[in-house]
Design a protein with these regions (language model features):
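Conserved glycine-rich cofactor-binding loop
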Residues: 11-12
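Conserved mid-core segment of classical short-chain dehydrogenase/reductases
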Residues: 68, 89-105, 148-151, 191
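Short, small/polar-rich loop/turn modules that mediate ligand/substrate recognition or access, typified
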Residues: 171, 176, 237-239
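Catalytic loop of short-chain dehydrogenase/reductase
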Residues: 133-172, 184-185
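Short C-terminal tail/terminal secondary-structure segment
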Residues: 233-254
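Conserved glycine-rich Rossmann-like NAD(P)H-binding loop of the short-chain dehydrogenase/reductase
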Residues: 25-42
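A glycine/serine/threonine-rich, flexible loop-to-helix segment
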Residues: 172, 185-210, 253-254
């Protein structure tokens, strides 16, 4: 039987790489994002590779109406899911104590509360007849000083704690719940691509001083590990865990 996965935030970056990785290994993929044109472009490309293997559902998961639309579309097309990847969040915001209360509340909503709401709704779509998985994409900023906005860091920390409790709550339903915390990842159009373009020298200096493996990570590496975590022989026994994919950055904080 073909397995089915929902990947939120999957029109670019880590989310897209994860969706492509699972699709290339025979999974049917539900793509989600807010850019209808990108969703159509990607789903059409994947369906050319394997017919009827990809859905593209435009939905802003901060909106209850869109969350319901996404849920109803999956139910009508597939019935159930075998895995959900929650790739939701934004690292925008003022650094340190310069952030306003409005920024703090907005970050908490985007990076934590909207994810919790989406997970509580969509976890009901997971198969009841066999083991299934939820993976949250977090950030090493949740417990490492990587100069991220405070609000982003503590929102991701809250997400890690939520995942631990959800892992306990869903354990009897054979649902594993884990968090993957990427470090500095180079993605097309992302912050590190921009910094590299602005000053390749400063970019290389940062990498050599802060990342022990002496290079920045790729979204494909995050996708590779995500797939392994879901499909590995020991995945049924891994739950409530958080795994850093950061080239050693989080243990090299000065």
């Amino acid at each position: 039987m073909i397995k089915k996965i929902l990947v939120t935030g999957s029109t670019r970056g880590i989310g897209l790489s994860v969706a492509e990785k699972f699709h290339s290994n025979g999974w049917n993929v539900c793509l989600n994002g807010r850019n209808q044109d990108k969703l159509m472009e990607i789903s059409e490309r994947l369906n050319k590779e394997r017919s009827n293997s990809a859905l593209g559902v435009k939905a802003d998961l901060s909106l209850n109406s869109d969350l319901n639309t996404l849920s109803e579309m999956i139910i009508s097309q597939w019935g159930t899911l075998d895995c959900i990847i929650f790739n939701i969040g934004s690292g925008h915001g003022s650094k340190g104590f310069a952030s306003t209360m409005e920024e703090n509340l907005a970050s908490l909503k985007t990076n934590f509360l909207d994810v919790v709401k989406s997970s509580n709704k969509l976890c009901k779509l997971l198969s009841q007849n066999q083991p299934s998985s939820i993976i949250f994409i977090g950030s090493i900023a949740q417990d490492s000083n990587v100069n991220a906005p405070f609000s982003y860091a503590y929102s991701k920390k809250a997400l890690n704690n939520f995942a631990r409790y959800q892992a306990i709550a869903l354990s009897k339903q054979k649902v594993s719940v884990n968090v993957i915390n990427p470090g500095h990842i180079l993605t097309e159009g992302g912050v590190w691509a921009r910094k590299k373009q602005e000053s390749n020298v400063e970019f290389n200096n940062f990498v050599s001083e802060n990342i022990p493996v002496q290079r920045i990570g790729t979204s494909e590496e995050v996708a590779e590990f995500t797939y392994m975590l879901v499909n590995g022989n020991s995945n049924k026994f891994i739950t409530g865990s958080q795994i850093n994919i950061d080239g050693g950055t989080s243990i090299n904080i000065k």
